[in-house]
Design a protein with these regions (language model features):
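A short, conserved, highly charged catalytic patch centered on acidic carboxylates
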Residues: 1-117, 128-163
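Carbohydrate-associated surface elements
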Residues: 123
């Protein structure tokens, strides 16, 4: 858990935010994951790079790679090899607070795995959904929303987020 690193990440994002939202720059999800979401998870104590050298079946974080369209979440957070939480990532230009499809996608992952919650993030926003509520036609991005954090809040609400 590294609060100083998190503050640096927030500062870097704030300084470059317009670039990430400009579709001409083609800043993509993979870049966002590498530059922001991986470090964000590490700031909250998750071993994304498997620095501990755990066997593949016991890694803390399983990262989905090399796919433009996947039916698996971008990250599976585990405890002793047992899936506990999914994190679905999007690029910053995707407005996850408003757009329905990313929310439904993330909620389906959590619902199908019988998880209590799922995280949807583009780094700028972190949405935590209650996945004990089945996704249904007509749902929107606010349906089953448990918590919402803006990137500027991550450091201030570090303990609250980490406790989830």
């Amino acid at each position: 858990m590294d609060l100083d690193r998190l503050k640096d990440l927030i500062k870097k994002y704030r300084e470059n935010m317009k670039y990430y939202h400009d579709t001409k720059n083609a800043y993509n999800e993979t870049e966002c994951r590498d530059e922001y979401i991986n470090p964000l998870l590490e700031c909250f104590g998750w071993d994304v790079q498997n620095v501990q050298g755990k066997l593949p079946q016991y890694k803390e974080v399983v990262v989905e790679r090399f796919s433009n369209y996947s039916e698996r979440p971008d990250y599976t957070l585990t405890l002793n090899g047992v899936s506990k939480l999914f994190v679905e990532a999007k690029k910053p230009s995707v407005d996850i607070v408003v757009e329905t499809e990313p929310a439904i996608q993330a909620r389906k992952y959590g619902w199908n795995a019988n998880h209590a919650m799922v995280i949807l993030t583009n780094f700028e926003d972190m949405l935590i959904y209650d996945t004990t509520i089945k996704p249904a036609p007509g749902d929107n991005a606010r349906t089953a929303l448990y918590r919402k954090y803006y990137f500027e809040e991550y450091a201030k609400k570090f303990d609250e987020i980490n406790a989830l």
